[in-house]
Every structure is written in C-alpha cells, then in structure tokens.
C-alpha cells in the first residue's frame, strides 16, 4: 500500500527551503562548498568586532559572518602581478555565495579577502554582511 511521506528537509523528493540563518550558513559552508570545490570550507564564524567593518545602510548590524578556506580553488591556479596585488581572485567565489544566499531568500553583500598566514599564504575569508530584512526576520523567528 502507498504510504505518503511527510514533507521534510531530509526528504530528497520533497526538499524544503531552509528559513533559518544558521542552518543556511552551515549548508553553504558544507554542502555547497563540497559540490563546488570537493571539500567543505575550513571555518565558519561570526565576528562582532565593530571596528573591523564599515557601517553601511545596507548592512543589518556591525556583525559579519565569515567562511574561511585555507586552500582556495581559484587562487591555486592563478598568479596575480605585483601591481595588482589588491585583486582577490576569490571574488568569483564570493559572487557564487552571494547568489546562493540571494536565491535562498537571504540577501547579503559578500566580499572576498585574502588573509595570509605563514602556513596558508592564499587563505581567503568570504565576508557576509546580511541585509537588514534578514536580521529582522531572524529576530521575529526567535533568533539572535
């Protein structure tokens, strides 16, 4: 006899779009990153250091979510001339993340920044500044 399956996010035949911010960011950090690059991103964190970010009308608060990858895909195969060292070739990755978040209903301004370390000279942080509407919705749903 035919059993009707309950609609849930874990049902691949009837997936639901996630409406909570943290779960969406975790999806980008793991699932989307694995599909695009073959491995999950190295780190997902939230910064609340107000002196690190420019205040803008678009941004919800002076907090930002960051996805870090120690060995970014596009930086591996490209060499940037010294006169263009401010160029971040991972801006393409930031655009993909921004498009994914926009498509999921989480508008944000997403940028890429190289944060070199001795161990990882191409280490890149994808900085996510969410739209005010996202944070208002998250607060209304009982989030942070």
Describe each region flagged by the PLM:
Residues 92, 105, 121-123:
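Eukaryote-biased feature marking scaffold/signaling PDZ-domain proteins and nuclear chromatin regulators
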Residues 94-107, 111:
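Mixed-charge, glycine-accented linear interaction segment located at domain edges/termini
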């Amino acid at each position: 006899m035919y059993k009707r399956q309950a609609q849930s996010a874990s049902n691949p035949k009837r997936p639901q779009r996630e409406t909570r911010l943290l779960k969406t960011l975790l999806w980008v950090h793991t699932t989307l990153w694995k599909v695009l690059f073959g491995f999950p991103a190295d780190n997902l964190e939230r910064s609340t250091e107000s002196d690190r970010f420019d205040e803008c009308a678009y941004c919800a608060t002076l907090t930002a979510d960051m996805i870090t990858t120690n060995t970014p895909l596009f930086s591996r195969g490209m060499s940037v001339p010294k006169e263009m060292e401010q160029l971040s070739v991972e801006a393409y990755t930031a655009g993909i993340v921004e498009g994914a978040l926009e498509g999921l209903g989480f508008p944000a301004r997403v940028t890429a920044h190289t944060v070199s370390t001795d161990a990882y000279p191409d280490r890149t942080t994808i900085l996510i500044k969410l739209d005010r509407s996202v944070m208002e919705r998250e607060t209304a749903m009982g989030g942070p």
